[in-house]
Amino acid sequence: MTLEQFFMENPRAALAFSGGVDSAYLLWAGVQAGAEVRPYFIKTPFQPQFEQEDARRLCEQLNVELTVIPLDIFTAPEVVANPMDRCYHCKKRLFFLLRGRAASDGFTLLLDGTNASDDAGDRPGMRALRELEVRSPLRECGLTKERIRELSRQAGLFTWDKPSYACLATRVPAGRPITRDDLEKAERGERVLSGLGFRDFRVRLTQNGCKLQVTEDQISLALDRRVDILDILTPLFPEITLDLRPRAVSD
């Protein structure tokens, strides 16, 4: 099955839209197929501001209206406790809310941007999607992340080379309760460090501070900019370390 065939069979759908590579291409494909695809962005403290800005920018490029739904995820104790299956509880909250809003707008089909490169396995987040009957056209059509990037480039989407970005909650070690302060520190640190030229990196919280993880090609940059990194992160964290084991590229 191709995406065009999928949207011919399913001409109306709500889309969980993050503004990332996958959901951006899925929205573009729906628009190109003449389908009515309504993108919904659920704004929680787990997402940095630039994600919403990218989502709006992409929708403006495609001349599609974006619906933003605010959610204070800190009202969900099963999420902020940060258990190993946090992602399951979080996605279930998000998609339950989204399904209700989409239904009130007249949409019975809910889509997300999971692709064929994502390992479904027993990942907690995938379980939530199955339970709530969320369909993943990119995965169903066999489109891998690499292929989606290439098709996005051909389509002229600015998201084609956007690094994958996991939610800010992943910066907090499992078992450590998530706080707004921790998320704000991680987001601020990553936002400022990106201005130094870092891409596809993480500022992860540790017991006494933070650990900077970069890809192999950026380790030398991290060492060269050590003083700048300390200037940026010292006001936020008492202890700062650099992981000398290179971070795997997101894709």
What are the residue ranges of the model-derived segments?
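Mid-to-C-terminal catalytic subdomains of enzymes
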Residues: R139-K145, R149-L193, G197-R202
